[in-house]
Amino acid sequence: MTCSRPTSCRRSCGRARRWRSPSPSTPRTWPGSCRFTASISGTTASGCFRKVNQLGKPSPLPPSGKGTGWDLEATLDVSMISVACPSCHIVVVEANSPGDRSLAKTDGAAARLGAQVISNSYGSRENGFALSHRQAYIHPGHTIVASAGDVGFTAASFPADLASVVSVGGTTLARAGGPRGWRESTWNDDVGAGGSGCSAYVAKPSWQHDRHCEGRTVADVSAVAANVPVFESSYGGWVTVDGTSIAAPLIAGIYGLAGNGGRVGPQDLYAHTSSLFDVTKGSNAFFQPPSVTCGDDYLCVARKGYDAPTGLGTPDGIGAF
């Protein structure tokens, strides 16, 4: 299990707000053989956590990302993976820069290190230059996950637009009655909105059958992306984070928990919709330039069955993974 971390913020970074813990002096630990506190105090000595550079080597590491947003991003990614899969062994692969070329190298390094699941909490607007690095995200035998973005319905995000990548959108949870105890809708608030889009570069894969997008549609699946508390010392303690940078590592962790990482990809989700909660409410129309319109189409509005903001739905156990 790996998460890639550039050293400065691009599009899909988690957005932080101050949050007060009811018991800030008591770090929370997760059950399982590989335990981390919410501030990631798991050490390399345990064998459960390590970090390497974009070549997969323990040194030299890039300069600290403190103050750039990526210190929080790394905390968030590792915390969400370990929440979903407490026994997963985690490797953070650090890129030298937030450019497409450096980021592409991190996935290759993760694959060479034997990671079964690779989580990418970043994205950029798709274009020809970004797509020139697509081969770096094609690794048979490895499940690759990427966040769909935090600015709602717009141009598809790279690398989430690739057919080899599980694209993850975002939802909001609220307390409700009933057996589940929650109601769920598309994430869209004053901080941002889960990404969705229709690729102008990547062909429609055979396993996607939505009708209003001729290319690859983002997203495939989704998870909670709002109001998640994380402890980060460089931010002075507990903060509340929003973004599909929450959702992507959660989904990656669920793949790790299921134990099928490396043998499944985005296409397998479409054959296991009964193991997903269908999200049917909400829109991700957040920031749309004049050239981008959606109306009430499934590309930006949740509805029964597949829709782009939440994909096929959110995990109901591990059956789809």
PLM regions and their residue ranges:
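Substrate-binding/charge-relay-adjacent region of secreted/lumenal peptidase catalytic domains
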Residues: M1-G170, G192-D242, A248, G259-G265, ...
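Walker A/P-loop NTP-binding active-site region of P-loop NTPases
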Residues: I254
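Intrinsically disordered, low-complexity segments enriched in Ser/Pro/Gly/Ala and basic residues
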Residues: I118, E184, G195-C198, T273-S274, ...
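Phosphate/diphosphate-binding glycine-rich loops and adjacent basic-rich segments that engage nucleotide
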Residues: G178-G194
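An often Trp-containing, charged/polar helix-loop segment at the C-terminal end
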Residues: G259-A308, L312
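Secretory-pathway extracellular proteins and peptide precursors enriched for disulfide-bonded cysteines
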Residues: D189-V191, C198, P205, S283-C294
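Short acidic, Gly/Pro-enriched loop/turn segments at secondary-structure junctions
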Residues: D100, A174-R180
